[in-house]
């Protein structure tokens, strides 16, 4: 039976609960891996299932299932389970107007429009470039895509049907000359492989040439430097060091954190604004409506240097007496929704990258990120770095890690550029409470930090 019809057969009025909802997800995923020219994996993974929740007297009961022909009886079983629990303080679920959201954007251009052979052909088109370079060892190409349809209905009359789509690949390689090595990668993101091969090859060729000078580049002298961070580093910094601390569930029961993160507190320069916004179609953080049926809002976490908001599910908003922001997300139908980011970024400023670099007499330009982590303090492993002298780039240097304290770094941001970019990925994602990988995106412009620890 069609999934929308399955939802219409559910009778929430027969349940003696305060609130109930159901989310059905149908997902198709493809993963392809080539290692040193050999095909190691080529799999397609379809799934269909539902996640059901009921709330009564402050207690939740929930279940995931792939049996979609007995949803009413599943709800009745959940009602029986939750009724056995001792009542807690009643959670005042906010009242919403009945509303249906239909947001189908990708049916005509989804990754499913390409065959498995076409996806393998895209990967194989990259292999000659990797294999013809004598300095490259152990090259790998990883392709992954996902097309997902979601249906939702709640006992307070909210429903939706929307789709999500992304595709992309990593070309990963190690350059080795004597005992010197340098690891690099090229990341691709698109909606469908059709017509992508030619530009992907050109991008890979340029990336290999750009990486070669780093094989024998000198290692940076550890210390504190004035730095320009590019848009990819900006995104990692924003997500890892600030975005997670803006997720409101971290504040529940933590009075010290509530005090530290009071709305209106000055935390950075006036030219700094940080946003979480799911309304960016064709990004990996695309989210028109969350897994509780709340529209995703553009949420300012920092506006003009001051704490302006935080990310909420319905429950965290109720408990902190704030407003839901549409950030309740689950990785798939097997998980409950929790507070997660979407597209998290720093808004652009006015100066070009060239103008930012020209302002630095002695410093570093940090480009790209291999990985990063952090809460109150952060560490990021950059992909590349260049020495800046007298306002000009002066050659590559090897940098292992940049690090700092979040609030100190926010206050040390001097200038924000206008070269805005959001970085999406079809591989990896964000991990939280065993829900990994959840698709997100992050970015912003380049910006100057007055002082940062570099090693």
Residue ranges and their predicted role:
Residues 1-455:
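N-terminal small-residue-enriched
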